[in-house]
Amino acid sequence: MALAGLCALLACCWGPAAVLATAAGDVDPSKELECKLKSITVSALPFLRENDLSIMHSPSASEPKLLFSVRNDFPGEMVVVDDLENTELPYFVLEISGNTEDIPLVRWRQQWLENGTLLFHIHHQDGAPSLPGQDPTEEPQHESAEEELRILHISVMGGMIALLLSILCLVMILYTRRRWCKRRRVPQPQKSASAEAANEIHYIPSVLIGGHGRESLRNARVQGHNSSGTLSIRETPILDGYEYDITDLRHHLQRECMNGGEDFASQVTRTLDSLQGCNEKSGMDLTPGSDNAKLSLMNKYKDNIIATSPVDSNHQQATLLSHTSSSQRKRINNKARAGSAFLNPEGDSGTEAENDPQLTFYTDPSRSRRRSRVGSPRSPVNKTTLTLISITSCVIGLVCSSHVNCPLVVKITLHVPEHLIADGSRFILLEGSQLDASDWLNPAQVVLFSQQNSSGPWAMDLCARRLLDPCEHQCDPETGRREHRAAGECLCYEGYMKDPVHKHLCIRNEWGTNQGPWPYTIFQRGFDLVLGEQPSDKIFRFTYTLGEGMWLPLSKSFVIPPAELAINPSAKCKTDMTVMEDAVEVREELMTSSSFDSLEVLLDSFGPVRDCSKDNGGCSKNFRCISDRKLDSTGCVCPSGLSPMKDSSGCYDRHIGVDCSDGFNGGCEQLCLQQMAPFPDDPTLYNILMFCGCIEDYKLGVDGRSCQLITETCPEGSDCGESRELPMNQTLFGEMFFGYNNHSKEVAAGQVLKGTFRQNNFARGLDQQLPDGLVVATVPLENQCLEEISEPTPDPDFLTGMVNFSEVSGYPVLQHWKVRSVMYHIKLNQVAISQALSNALHSLDGATSRADFVALLDQFGNHYIQEAIYGFEESCSIWYPNKQVQRRLWLEYEDISKGNSPSDESEERERDPKVLTFPEYITSLSDSGTKHMAAGVRMECHSKGRCPSSCPLCHVTSSPDTPAEPVLLEVTKAAPIYELVTNNQTQRLLQEATMSSLWCSGTGDVIEDWCRCDSTAFGADGLPTCAPLPQPVLRLSTVHEPSSTLVVLEWEHSEPPIGVQIVDYLLRQEKVTDRMDHSKVETETVLSFVDDIISGAKSPCAMPSQVPDKQLTTISLIIRCLEPDTIYMFTLWGVDNTGRRSRPSDVIVKTPCPVVDDVKAQEIADKIYNLFNGYTSGKEQQTAYNTLLDLGSPTLHRVLYHYNQHYESFGEFTWRCEDELGPRKAGLILSQLGDLSSWCNGLLQEPKISLRRSSLKYLGCRYSEIKPYGLDWAELSRDLRKTCEEQTLSIPYNDYGDSKEI
């Protein structure tokens, strides 16, 4: 019944709404109430055309042109975007959001004010009269009718909401009253013993009387004008033969009502009966003989049993009627007060009736107090109550959500050309709305006002107008008003102060105390915010917004973010370090003012790390206290030469003894002892010496850690335990047990592997016993002795540095000769760590610094040898003054060796297998005194081991009685030393130290393909120095000698796979003016290989000849436009991606003398003789003068030489010129002879000067953009094919005397 009433109530609520909607027309109500967004574009063209359109096309477009006054009476932000070209017209974009009924209320108007201001006002429909230029939005035709219906609709719905809320509050009040009322049981009426014996009281559980039954019972009682009382018991009693006093019961019920319904509150829930009050109870008809009440109770019980119990209804009805018909007394018609009739009309009261529907009659009065779970005060809310509350809340929410008006918001976006808005423009916004200048790249100095409503006063917003210099931390508008400032004052957070130059920025001035290690020890890779690289020049301290305290940018464009930041720190850091194309110098002055020249200066600004004046600064044992703040120091450091113990309780020498605090008792089997050893030079400092010991009756083993019983006897008197480890440095093939450095290709000093001789290990041809696990393979004799001789090449040492090049002799030549005898292949099968390495590793664990691991690698190497070859090797290097000498000696050697060497079939070959080697021939020339054949020839020889007697090619022979001692020739297979470590943590740290030692000089960590340098590995310029930058060696080309105007330079491109990324090479060219002092230069030119040479920017005088590819790493460069007979100095640097430069490499060379065509000079000499012979006319004189004047100094020298050689009998050249041309003209011609140096003058007097030409290929590149940070050197040759084409250049040379054989 209650749910039906609720449904009817909802129907009443929604009914008028539907009628109103229908009366308004055939319009969908949901469409009328939905939120919509409408965008309108408003152009300023009409007003600019009517007034002064010429301001948009002014030549000085960079200056502000127009004053704006924009006012918005609606809530919504104002956005200014200067994204238009200077020739485009400004326009407004209005984004109106709200109900469809509210959007037409928005009006706007544009007006040109007298002071030249463009006014744009957004206002309400009724907020301003209709003015010219006022544009309305679209309005529906029946707006007034809809407005009235909307008001009526809202009124009806408001009444429904209030009614529903009242019902809900009433239910909650009654529920609260029932919960806090104390339950009380009414005393049962007394009855006689005869009635107790003759009749039996049957109790029907109240849960069996469902909601429909109780409702019908109530209706029957009301219709019959009869009332019945209620007993405050859980079950409804049916009294058979019960006699009672009606007056007493009536008084009891009246007391119950006057007591506030305590028994009423003890029922399960509330019912609609409770709304009838106590008047109904007091008006009940309790007169005996009320048959209507009796029949109503029987019908009620019948209906309830049929609805809730599967028991046969006929049987139940018969049982009940037998009781009612046999009784002649009056019974009280009781109605259960359970609230399930209202809360659960379907009959589900939430009790055990569903689980146990069988009807039970109780005859024991004490059992009638069975309680229902629904009526338990611990669970007062059942499913029905929750359902009612949910339905009510849902209906209220539905009604409210369907009638909540969308707020009317108007967002204005002003699109203008750059610099169009003039300073002094004003914007008036509602309070709470903001001006968005994020897309306003060049904001003007505008004035902002805020107003509470469209008619309220304007208040100047001093903080919001700070568009050009927004406050970094916070803004105080009140201070600006009090001091009459144009903008609000910027304030800084606690611990910060204003920058002295930029008042709107803040710098930190309080850093607090830090006792302990410097908290920012991790240097992450720095990133250029544009290119993503790692250069740096200075160190700064700034804060970032992740709460970590500080970060250390290393330059204004390169930052080092902490580990928590992403690769692009500008997206998350509140700094002015952002470097963009349009904002490079955002905070340069501020950074300069707060910069530090070095990391030490930065750390000193934070004060001392500890107070060492008392109690050693809190440092324990033999730690020294230092107050200087270091990046990786806690203020407690160990004395020099000592390392901290694993528990940091003291310092010890890790090279001596053990560490008792390592958690493993120092590796000692029994005792680990400590002893204080003072320093001899400073008694205040001492070393904690730790060593192993044994208890009584035990002695220390040979390993210094194990203990053995003193009484223990060993067989045959030998030592107990493992066999003693022997040093392997005096053993054959002993290098196999030592460490190896795979970079330097040298054997380390420390023994890595244990060598024992417990097994009889011998090899064929060797008398000595070999260590255990060593496998030796002997190479056959016919494959042992091999000779190698290289092709003669220019001496590389001559081609670099100070090059004493002579165009007469050319390059000196170097040739290598080598004989190698590989005798044994050695392999190590068994690997066991030596005691020395074991002791060193045992002192290292996760708490040890990288420096300790690097020291171990320096001692034991980074690899251990697995396979190697042994034998004998002899090498000789032979230098020749030029290639002609080498050619003559080699041809002579071939003739001699072929003529004097015995044939393979002769008996002499068998008797004396010795053959003549080329080094022996060179030695014989020196010994025989044939100086003219060996002038300028020298030879140096080196040997490894002793030459075996089976090899006839050895230059230095040894006595046949001396046994051959094979030496280590080459390590063919090696493994990292960290693979020998079993502890995972120690192995990982040793591997990291190995990588750091190989690529980062031991002062940085390898991160992917780059080195993260330690704080101590930064140079004076602030650049990292841990990854050594390879030095390119600049040299003259080995193929093309310098000419009079051209030099070919080359170098090898070398880039390690980790730590360094070469991005460019810089070449400096200087002209030396003083031949004795090369520091005096006249001109200087610096060229970038990437930007100037291969890009084609300066290709006329510098051209690439060869670039690297996948096979070759040589870079060859052609330098043209040089002056003959001039000293030039070329300097080369390599540049990596951090901006570092490698150590320079120099080449100082003098260009050859000017090239002359001797054939042409002789022809000119013949021509001059013919002109001067006999009578010389004026025309012939002028021809001779013009010819000689245009020759130039070198050719004039050769003309003079040939003229005097052939025609001196008719007069010397100088005299003939003066006689034929006159002194003045002859002086002008002969003055050119002094332009050359004495060296070139001497060369031009050679009787024979030949001219030859050499072809040189080069790359002619047209201009293109080369990105150095994305340069792939291995693919450079392929990439340049797109912009460069191969061309040929002809180079002239002079050969003085006999022609060279190049």
Curated annotation (Swiss-Prot):
What is the scientific name of the source organism? Homo sapiens (Human)
Where does the UniProt entry place glycosylation sites? N115, N453, N729, N742, N804, N984
Taxonomically, the superkingdom here is Eukaryota
Mark the residues carrying the PTM Omega-N-methylarginine. Answer: R337
Note the topology in the membrane: Multi-pass membrane protein
So what family is this one in?
A: Belongs to the astrotactin family.
Disulphides: C463-C475, C471-C490, C492-C506, C612-C625, C619-C636, C638-C651, C660-C672, C668-C692, C694-C707, C785-C951, C876-C941, C947-C954, C1000-C1011, C1013-C1026, C1101-C1121, C1153-C1240, C1261-C1284
**Membrane-crossing residue ranges in chain numbering:** 154-174, 384-402
Q: Which residues form the Fibronectin type-III domain?
A: 1030-1145
InterPro entries, per the entry: Annexin-like (IPR040685), ASTN1_2_Fn3 (IPR045574), ASTN_1_2_N (IPR045575), Astrotactin (IPR026995), EGF-like_dom (IPR000742), FN3_sf (IPR036116), MACPF (IPR020864)
Cleavable signal peptide: 1-21
What's the subunit arrangement here?
Answer: Interacts with ASTN2; the interaction is not calcium-dependent.
The record's region (Disordered) falls at 340-380
Q: Which residues form the EGF-like domain?
A: 459-507, 608-652, 656-708
Q: Which residues lie on this side of the membrane: Cytoplasmic?
A: 175-383
Protein name per Swiss-Prot or TrEMBL: Astrotactin-1
Key words, A-Z: Cell adhesion, Cell membrane, Cytoplasmic vesicle, Disulfide bond, EGF-like domain, Endosome, Glycoprotein, Membrane, Methylation, Phosphoprotein, Repeat, Signal, Transmembrane, Transmembrane helix
Where does this protein reside within or beyond the cell?
Cell membrane; Perikaryon; Endosome; Cytoplasmic vesicle, Clathrin-coated vesicle
Q: Cross-referenced Gene3D superfamilies, in alphabetical order?
A: Laminin
Gene encoding it? ASTN1
PTM Phosphoserine: list the residues. Answer: S227
